[in-house]
């Protein structure tokens, strides 16, 4: 009964979120990009709740995703270009189709040996994040000889993102002692492959049901008229639903680049952009969120990462010294970690895929450069409870335990107990 009541209350409080998602994307079409969203296109106001009187920050721990990048797949660009080139050979492109193909062919030249690489936009995102971290928590990052341990997965774009943030931290405090580490030995918690119950649950994804959802929300007819002058030829010769989705992926990721044909996003109407976002929202939720379809187990893919965060915090809190731990990886870790930690509404469980957009919006969790920060506070004088505050993409988040009298500040002992028991229960 309690669970049902919770979901009913959730419906009351979160129904406006569906309207907000549509309004968000109409106002800022780039949010339809899901994991391709440029971090700097949805910055918060950076107004934070002051710590309880007498408390000061002393430890910072974090996991962050790399910044904006080129698309990864070897065929991600060419699979869009090929059908348009085929249409050009048969004289089936409209004038707009010719323009779009020309833009894509020209841009494709820049992708040579660049697939998956960090872009200048991505580098800039991390310079901004690093600079703000130092500004927001000077008690930690401007303290003399502060120790900063920064680790990255072995992927170049993650390493360069780490470098960009650390450059800003060093610029803010030349006395900082920064240790950088990159190794396969760290992958077991920075970016671990699925295994055990998580891997088994991933196999429960109902591809037929998701495919039907995707088809219901893909309406290529208008776009095909924009690109092709012969609709019968297009229907017979082009996989129209597939082309629409793949062209959208290329167009929406143009925000990851400086001097790119970013206006390609205008090929899609507001309704089409929203539909394509809903498709991706569902896909990410089922594979990485707290989805009933995958047994509500996918967030536990970050079991090792949360364990590392807890254990490292134990050591640093016991030492009591001013220091920081930074980790750099991927959205496939940030997304389930945010769910596992139960930051804000990230861990909501929704059965009806058609209703998901009302309760859960992926662009709020994992844009390019997304990050989770935990800041620990202790009494400036004397003894007292250690407090912790969570930020998701530099926004204050609620946590799944009772807060102190000051919103967004929680007793670390309570939070640690909750997370530890949750992990232990899963591991039984």
Write out the residue ranges for each language-model feature.
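Signature for phosphate-centric chemistry
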Residues: 19-149, 153-325, 329-428
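Bacterial Sec-dependent N-terminal signal peptides
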Residues: 1-21
């Amino acid at each position: 009964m309690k669970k049902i009541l919770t979901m009913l209350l959730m419906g009351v409080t979160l129904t406006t979120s569906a309207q907000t998602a549509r309004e968000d994307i109409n106002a800022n079409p780039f949010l339809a990009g899901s994991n391709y969203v440029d971090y700097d296109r949805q910055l918060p106001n950076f107004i934070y709740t002051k710590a309880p009187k007498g408390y000061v920050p002393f430890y910072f721990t974090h996991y962050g995703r790399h910044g904006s990048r080129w698309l990864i797949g070897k065929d991600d660009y060419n699979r869009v270009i090929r059908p348009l080139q085929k249409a050009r050979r048969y004289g089936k492109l409209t004038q707009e189709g010719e323009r779009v193909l020309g833009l894509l062919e020209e841009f494709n030249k820049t992708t040579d040996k660049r697939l998956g690489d960090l872009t200048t936009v991505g580098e800039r995102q991390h310079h901004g994040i690093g600079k703000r971290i130092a500004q927001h928590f000077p008690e930690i990052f401007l303290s003399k000889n502060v120790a900063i341990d920064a680790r990255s997965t072995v992927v170049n774009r993650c390493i360069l993102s780490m470098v960009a943030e650390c450059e800003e931290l060093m610029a803010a405090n030349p006395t900082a002692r920064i240790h950088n580490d990159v190794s396969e030995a760290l992958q077991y918690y920075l970016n671990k492959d699925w295994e055990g119950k998580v891997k088994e649950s991933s196999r429960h994804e109902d591809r037929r049901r998701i495919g039907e959802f995707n088809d219901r929300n893909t309406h290529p007819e208008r776009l095909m008229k924009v690109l092709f002058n012969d609709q019968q030829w297009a229907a017979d010769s082009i996989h129209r639903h597939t082309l629409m989705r793949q062209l959208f992926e290329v167009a929406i990721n143009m925000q990851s680049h400086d001097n790119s044909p970013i206006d390609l996003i205008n090929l899609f109407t507001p309704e089409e952009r929203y539909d394509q976002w809903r498709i991706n929202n569902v896909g990410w939720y089922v594979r990485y969120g707290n989805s009933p379809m995958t047994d509500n187990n996918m967030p536990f893919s970050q079991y090792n990462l949360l364990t590392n965060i807890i254990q490292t915090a134990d050591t640093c809190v016991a030492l009591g010294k001013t220091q920081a731990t930074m980790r750099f990886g991927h959205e496939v870790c940030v997304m389930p970690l945010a769910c596992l930690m139960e930051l804000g509404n990230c861990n909501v469980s929704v059965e009806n895929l058609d209703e998901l957009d009302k309760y859960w919006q992926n662009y709020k969790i994992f844009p390019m450069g997304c990050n989770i920060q935990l800041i620990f506070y202790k009494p400036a004088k004397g003894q007292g409870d250690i407090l912790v505050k969570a930020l998701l993409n530099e926004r204050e988040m609620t946590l799944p335990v009772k807060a102190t009298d000051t919103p967004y500040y929680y007793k670390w002992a309570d939070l640690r107990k909750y997370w530890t028991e949750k992990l232990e229960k899963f591991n039984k």
